[in-house]
């Protein structure tokens, strides 16, 4: 069996003993049914990975001995801040999971005129917690040792107005530029992905006022979740660490 990778939310140190957090303990003790003497890999978001060994396990708690740690940097040289207008149901979860596997550094859920998601503050907070857990699970699976933050949801214009020294991109079906025509080098990108119905004309004009560049991904119309992953992949191939 592949050695499980587990995220620990507190800083780790070599040659220490810790108790895993509740979610991790449930996964190791109840789902995988692992026991004393079995090996784990732990990471705490600091770009380090630690070998570890289970010392005790029950259905409710798992304690481990942390062994040696080492730096294991798998982050892309391209910092991508994804601004994703929220989509319904599992589409947003899928976008978050796959974007993190592809190396996105930061994700901000957005509200726009045509956003199909209407949540009160309590439900939205629960969604944010759920999305952050999805981000952690994606890092555990793909080998990243830093966990990207899922920021609190924002209004589209407030996000566009934030100061950012990087390249600002907006996907537009009638744009004249493509990712391949963007000048090199690029180290930071703020990538805007609109809702299923697209941005309104006023919103597109607003992004231009904040110096966003419209880009075209190709001749076909893509769903919002496909658009995000296609754009991230193309950016990583041209400016990052794919290909």
From Swiss-Prot:
Major location category of this protein: cytoplasm
Name the Enzyme Commission number(s) assigned to this protein: 2.1.1.193
InterPro entries registered for this protein in UniProt: Alpha/beta_knot_MTases (IPR029028), PUA-like_sf (IPR015947), RsmE (IPR006700), RsmE_MTase_dom (IPR046886), RsmE_PUA-like (IPR046887), tRNA_m1G_MTases_N (IPR029026)
Which Gene3D superfamilies does the entry mention?
3.40.1280.10, Hypothetical PUA domain-like, domain 1 (2.40.240.20)
Q: Which GO terms describe its cellular component?
A: cytoplasm
Per the UniProt entry, what are the Gene Ontology biological process annotations, in alphabetical order? rRNA base methylation
Subcellular localization(s) per the UniProt record: Cytoplasm
Which reactions is this enzyme annotated as catalysing? Answer: uridine(1498) in 16S rRNA + S-adenosyl-L-methionine = N(3)-methyluridine(1498) in 16S rRNA + S-adenosyl-L-homocysteine + H(+)
Activity sensitivity to pH: Optimum pH is 7-9.
Keywords, in A-Z order? Cytoplasm, Methyltransferase, rRNA processing, S-adenosyl-L-methionine, Transferase
Q: Name one GO molecular function term.
A: protein homodimerization activity
Subunit and partners:
Homodimer.
Stated family: Belongs to the RNA methyltransferase RsmE family.
Stated role: Specifically methylates the N3 position of the uracil ring of uridine 1498 (m3U1498) in 16S rRNA. Acts on the fully assembled 30S ribosomal subunit.
Recorded protein name is Ribosomal RNA small subunit methyltransferase E
Could you tell me the gene encoding this protein?
Answer: rsmE
């Amino acid at each position: 069996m592949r050695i499980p990778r587990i995220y620990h939310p507190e800083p780790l140190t070599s040659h220490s003993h810790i108790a895993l957090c509740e979610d991790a303990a449930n996964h190791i003790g109840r789902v995988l049914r692992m026991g004393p003497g079995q090996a784990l890999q732990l990471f705490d978001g600091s770009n380090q990975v630690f070998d570890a060994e289970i010392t005790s396990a029950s259905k409710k708690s798992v304690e481990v001995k942390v062994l040696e740690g080492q730096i294991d940097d798998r982050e892309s040289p391209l910092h991508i801040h994804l601004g994703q207008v929220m989509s319904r149901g599992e589409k947003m979860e899928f976008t978050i999971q796959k974007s993190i596997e592809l190396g996105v550094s930061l994700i901000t859920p957005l509200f726009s005129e045509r956003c199909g998601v209407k949540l009160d503050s309590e439900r939205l907070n629960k969604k944010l917690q759920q999305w952050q857990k999805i981000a952690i699970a994606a890092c555990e699976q793909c080998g990243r040792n830093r966990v990207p933050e899922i920021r609190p949801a924002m209004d589209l214009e407030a996000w566009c107005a934030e100061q950012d020294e990087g390249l600002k991109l907006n996907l537009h079906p009638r744009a004249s530029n493509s990712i391949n025509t963007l000048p090199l080098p690029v180290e930071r990108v703020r990538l805007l992905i609109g809702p299923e119905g697209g941005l309104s004309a006023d919103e597109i004009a607003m992004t231009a006022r904040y110096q966003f560049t419209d880009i075209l991904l190709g001749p076909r119309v893509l769903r919002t979740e496909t658009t995000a992953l296609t754009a991230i992949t193309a950016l990583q191939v041209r400016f990052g660490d794919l290909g």
